[in-house]
């Protein structure tokens, strides 16, 4: 597995090669409300959760990177694409590479997202690059 910074770097290289002006941005640390705001604006969001939203496995792998930094890998971490939500039903819709398109309880999804260090990456189209507020009043307007 890999985490958000590597995905952003790799995705941006690919997007630059395509020449369409899309950008990848690391949203790690942002609230679920911010992620839902991105989805509402047509921007797909890669999120880190646990496989099938199960409780996080406490077992971890530790190592030292070539730069001498400590690194940790959670065994049960998993990436899904957040692609929709229903506030009335309190659900999110994700595209999961293991399960396909699936709905999850929003509260459970948010909990698992937080357990895996609130990692997220958004892919933005050129027309959505202006007004890229995060954690602002604008977010509150779209997601209440």
Regions found by a protein language model. Give the residues of each.
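Cysteine-nucleophile protease catalytic domains, especially the papain-like/related folds used
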Residues: 1-44, 117-143
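Residues that act as N-cap/strand-start positions at coil-to-secondary-structure junctions
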Residues: 31, 76-79
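Short, structured secondary-structure boundary patches
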Residues: 41-48, 69
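Generic short beta-strand segments
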Residues: 48-56
């Amino acid at each position: 597995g890999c985490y958000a910074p590597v995905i952003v770097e790799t995705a941006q290289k690919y997007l630059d090669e395509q020449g369409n002006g899309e950008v990848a941005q690391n949203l790690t640390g942002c609230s679920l409300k911010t992620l839902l705001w991105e989805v509402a604006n047509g921007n797909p969001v890669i999120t880190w959760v646990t496989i099938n939203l199960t409780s996080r496995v406490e077992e971890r792998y530790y190592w030292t990177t070539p730069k001498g930094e400590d690194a940790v890998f959670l065994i049960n971490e998993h990436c899904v694409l957040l692609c929709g939500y229903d506030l009335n039903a309190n659900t999110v819709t994700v595209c999961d590479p293991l399960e396909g398109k699936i709905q999850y309880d929003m509260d459970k999804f948010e909990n698992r997202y937080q357990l895996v260090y609130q990692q997220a990456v958004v892919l933005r189209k050129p027309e959505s690059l202006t007004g890229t507020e995060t954690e602002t009043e604008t977010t509150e307007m779209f997601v209440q």
